[in-house]
Amino acid sequence: MISWHDLYTVLTAVIPLYVAMILAYGSVRWWKIFSPDQCSGINRFVAIFAVPLLSFHFISTNNPYAMNLRFIAADTLQKIIMLSLLVLWANFTRSGSLEWSITIFSLSTLPNTLVMGIPLLIAMYGEYSGSLMVQIVVLQCIIWYTLLLFLFEFRGAKMLIMEQFPETAASIVSFKVESDVVSLDGHDFLETDAEIGDDGKLHVTVRKSNASRRSFCGPNMTPRPSNLTGAEIYSLSTTPRGSNFNHSDFYNMMGFPGGRLSNFGPADMYSVQSSRGPTPRPSNFEENCAMASSPRFGYYPGGGAGSYPAPNPEFSSTTTSTANKSVNKNPKDVNTNQQTTLPTGGKSNSHDAKELHMFVWSSNGSPVSDRAGLNVFGGAPDNDQGGRSDQGAKEIRMLVPDQSHNGETKAVAHPASGDFGGEQQFSFAGKEEEAERPKDAENGLNKLAPNSTAALQSKTGLGGAEASQRKNMPPASVMTRLILIMVWRKLIRNPNTYSSLIGLIWALVAFRWHVAMPKIIQQSISILSDAGLGMAMFSLGLFMALQPKLIACGNSVATFAMAVRFLTGPAVMAVAAIAIGLRGDLLRVAIVQAALPQGIVPFVFAKEYNVHPAILSTGVIFGMLIALPITLVYYILLGL
């Protein structure tokens, strides 16, 4: 039986952690002590110094020659069971998907062992359980986080290949990734160059696009055409990126009388549409500058029959209807251009689908720098056709739903990954629903070749061809090499990688030959690692305070995530531990460890790669709040 003294011991060890977290939360939300920039500095200190040195301290002082192999085997078996079930689910069921498999694996098997687990388990089951937790931390940092990174990079590589080489991927025999490309997470514009070798196979080079190196210099600067080609990752809907560029401050600084003159953003200058011609977005130019003669779409009539307004290049359902009205005013133009209609499937939807009507210009005649352009950018009016060139224009029509779920990538504008909003309905992004989307909707736009008519096709029109395209991938050895290159480049930039490996190497040397660390080095590490635990919880509190809401993904999804975290994980761990033969306190430690709150590193990866970040955010924040009573319930029940 668990005595009141045992409960008090546990609370004594855990409540101070929550005090640090609550102080950080109040410092931002209630007392306004820290600004977001200051919070960012604190979090960076914790990520680079405090947590790596804390993990180094625990790992270097733990005897690797006294590791409990059966306990490690049980933990490993739990993760293998979950991974195997998720692989089967993703490949052999209609509702399975790679994104959900990664998310469920993170929720069920990767708890916050370092910060929360070590002090909690030591208070519950003694010092030996703390040593077991350190062993779990070593495996997490060296093996399981690397595996998770491998899965994310596999997803990124698969998206890149499906977008750039939908028909010829099987002919790729090598990838060369330039040194400045760190990841395939979609943060940077990437372009691919394919060369045909003597053997008739493709040799692909992946590099950063010049557009990602440019900066938006000023409002009077005429945007120059970028050298973006069809072989480029545009990250339109798969990994939407929000910008911290403050347009209001920028325009005030440059002397504009009003606020932002239009919603033309720096990213738009180098988007898929703007690299092929001037495609202005709906502007509030006339509202701010009281220019009643300025048309709504930034379109300056030239009286020619070839003039037509440019629709919003973003896939936004809020501006689609307006764009259609403007396009329908010139029916002749609609008939003179090739058009492709994308059905969304025969199944009716609860939300009305809206028709997206847009034009795509060829990169051969980019009139942005050659012509006077739009008056918004300081150019003179063009008498020919109002600053627009319709040469090489291709017309695209597609039906898009008016709402999408967070974490699911459709051809609709999503909020930035840092917003964590809009996830109010629970649905797997599975194959059944994907059949109603445009082809490769989870990857954004298909490759738009300069000489093509942007032939976007729907999955419903492919039928059996979809399965054959999935098999149309490079050889496994080529894919593996590409992914390993990207994973290696990510790992060597992560301070936790060095702290874990150096700590393990030092422990192997120190406990083998009984070598003591020099006092100066030991005290230098100790003074920072001692603060690491409190600073990690403080940083978590800052993170909670900076979020718009604690439950960012909707109640139904949050309930599902908490069930996976606190029920599925411990249940699978119990099965694995019993199968390995753990009994007594070892079994209890294994189960309670599996019921710890969600780890922070999986959330960081989910945010970087934009794979259900709202769910992992809720798992970290809300999971931390309810973790103490849940672990106490497990502790009491297992002690009966």
UniProtKB/Swiss-Prot annotation:
Q: Which residues lie on this side of the membrane: Cytoplasmic?
A: 29-38, 93-101, 153-500, 546-559, 607-619
Is Phosphoprotein one of the keywords?
yes
List the PANTHER family: AUXIN EFFLUX CARRIER COMPONENT 1B-RELATED (PTHR31752), AUXIN EFFLUX CARRIER COMPONENT 3 (PTHR31752:SF60)
Modified residue Phosphothreonine is at which positions? T322
Keyword Ligase on entry: no
Q: Its gene?
A: PIN3
Impact of altering Q140A?
A: Reduced auxin (e.g. IAA) efflux carrier activity. Strongly reduced auxin (e.g. IAA) efflux carrier activity
How is the protein's activity regulated, according to its record? Auxin efflux carrier activity is competitively inhibited by naptalamate (N-1-naphthylphthalamic acid, NPA).
Protein source organism: Arabidopsis thaliana (Mouse-ear cress)
Q: Where is this region: Disordered?
A: 310-351, 372-391, 404-471
- Chain positions with Phosphoserine modification: S226, S243, S283, S366
According to the record, mutating I48R results in: Disturbed oligomerization leading to reduced auxin (IAA) transport activity
**Gene ablation phenotype (knockout):** Plants display defects in hypocotyl differential growth. The triple mutant pin3 pin4 pin7 is able to suppress partially the highly branched phenotype of strigolactone deficient mutants lacking MAX2 and MAX4. The abcb19 pin3 pin4 pin7 quadruple mutant exhibits an additive phenotype on strigolactone-mediated bud outgrowth responses and shoot branching control.
Provide one Gene Ontology biological process annotation: root hair initiation
Q: Where are the transmembrane segments?
A: 8-28, 39-59, 72-92, 102-122, 132-152, 501-521, 525-545, 560-580, 586-606, 620-640
In this chain, composition skew of type Basic and acidic residues spans: 430-442
Q: Where in the cell is it found?
A: Cell membrane
Subunit structure, per the record?
Answer: Homodimer.
Q: Which NCBIfam families match?
A: 2a69
List, alphabetically, the Pfam families matched: Mem_trans
Q: Where is the composition biased (Polar residues)?
A: 314-348, 449-460
The identity of this protein, by name, is Auxin efflux carrier component 3
Q: Which GO terms describe its cellular component?
A: cell surface; lateral plasma membrane; mitochondrion; plasma membrane; vesicle membrane
Give the result of I527R, as annotated: Disturbed oligomerization leading to reduced auxin (IAA) transport activity. Disturbed oligomerization leading to reduced auxin (IAA) transport activity
Induction info: Down-regulated by endoplasmic reticulum stress treatment.
The molecular function GO annotations come to:
auxin efflux transmembrane transporter activity; identical protein binding; protein homodimerization activity
Question: In UniProt terms, what is the effect of altering I600A?
Answer: Reduced auxin (e.g. IAA) efflux carrier activity
